[in-house]
């Protein structure tokens, strides 16, 4: 689901709210999460999950096209860990 599809679905569920207000809320939430991660903070939404940073150590990689070794520097990557309630909701037994 894209961001615009999310906003459309929220608008359909909340017809009394203007679409622009929903758009501003979605963008605001995503910006808050991004800004918090940029500052090194962890964001937890109880029952849904938490967003944090994982730090990757420098390592020796390989260029898949040429096979040459490439030094990759250390970096931080965003990480999402699903909460118990979200895990339970999506764990549908066949």
Curated annotation (Swiss-Prot):
Record's GO cellular component terms: chromosome; cytosol
Keyword terms of this UniProt record: DNA recombination, DNA-binding, Transcription, Transcription regulation, Translation regulation
Cited SMART domains: BHL
Single GO MF descriptor: structural constituent of chromatin
Pfam family, one: Bac_DNA_binding
A single BP term in Gene Ontology: regulation of DNA-templated transcription
Signal peptide from the UniProt entry: none
UniProt xrefs under PROSITE patterns: HISTONE_LIKE
SUPFAM superfamilies referenced in this protein's UniProt entry, alphabetically: IHF-like DNA-binding proteins
NCBIfam families on file: hip, PRK00199.1
Primary role: This protein is one of the two subunits of integration host factor, a specific DNA-binding protein that functions in genetic recombination as well as in transcriptional and translational control.
Similarity field: Belongs to the bacterial histone-like protein family.
Complexes and interactors: Heterodimer of an alpha and a beta chain.
The protein's name: Integration host factor subunit beta
Species of the source: Haemophilus influenzae (strain ATCC 51907 / DSM 11121 / KW20 / Rd)
């Amino acid at each position: 689901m894209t961001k615009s599809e999310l906003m459309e679905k929220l608008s359909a569920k909340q017809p009394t709210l203007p679409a622009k207000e929903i758009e501003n809320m979605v963008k605001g939430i995503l910006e808050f999460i991004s800004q918090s991660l940029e500052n090194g903070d962890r964001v937890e939404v109880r029952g849904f999950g938490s967003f944090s940073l994982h730090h990757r150590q420098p390592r020796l990689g390989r260029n898949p096209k040429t096979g040459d070794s490439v030094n990759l520097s250390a970096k931080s990557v965003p990480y999402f860990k699903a909460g118990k309630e979200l895990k339970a909701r999506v764990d549908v037994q066949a």
